[in-house]
Amino acid sequence: GEIKDLTTEDCYVTFMAGIFRSVRFGAASSHGKANMMCFNFFESNGAFTRNTDGTYKVDFAKMKLAVNSWAEKILIYQGNGDYDGALSYLKDNATIKEQLQKELDALKTANIPVDIVFEQGKEALGL
């Protein structure tokens, strides 16, 4: 069905939340690398800030510009067939930086699960 009453700002915040969730699995997979490149690009363009209490805040005006610039960057690499440029960008930007890694480590130390696992089947039901 159609999702109604959804703003662009809602989408920005949800997208960032998705990146935070995804990166908890690491940045080794293609999805993890892509998300870290995006996160680092947004960070360097001021699309969000980290507050002193460890929370993050999206700057909606800067996020809009960053999303457009990010799409432009990717499309230019693809359109020009610039494999070497894309690979260089990947190597430089598909990493978890120190501050974010500290925050991820704190989640692990607090035993906050990366993903929820539901026990299912006959054994879980005692059958």
Each model region followed by its residue ranges:
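Long, well-structured alpha-helical subdomains associated
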Residues: 2-90
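Non-catalytic terminal regions of proteins
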Residues: 64-127
